[in-house]
Design a protein with these regions (language model features):
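Loop/turn positions that initiate beta-strands
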Residues: 48-50
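Beta-strand/loop nucleic-acid-binding surfaces
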Residues: 28-45
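Residue-level recognition of beta-strand microenvironments
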Residues: 8-10
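Short, flexible beta-strand-to-coil junctions
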Residues: 24-28, 56-58
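OB-fold/S1-family single-stranded nucleic acid-binding modules
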Residues: 56-71
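Short aromatic-glycine-enriched beta-strand elements
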Residues: 12-23
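Short coil-to-beta-strand transition motifs
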Residues: 1-4
Length: 71
């Protein structure tokens, strides 16, 4: 699913970097939250980024930067 990051909150747990994300799927208004380790998301995520969200059984397991749309 395609979405936009609304908030990105980095934190560390037992020495491992994680991110708490608030994202809004395209075409929806209700935000969703996800917590992912640094290896499940691209480097330096920022609010406003367009992303491609991958989930298994409704659980987000990977977030990639969405390719730029051509005009």
């Amino acid at each position: 699913m395609r979405a936009h990051l609304q908030a990105v909150m980095p934190y560390e747990l037992h020495g491992t970097p994680y991110y708490q994300l608030v994202l809004v799927p395209d075409g929806e208004q209700r935000p969703q939250q996800a917590r992912l380790s640094h290896d499940m998301i691209y480097a330096d995520p920022r609010p406003g980024d367009a992303v491609e969200v991958h989930a298994i059984l409704g659980i987000i397991d990977r977030v990639e930067r969405a390719p730029a749309e051509e005009s």
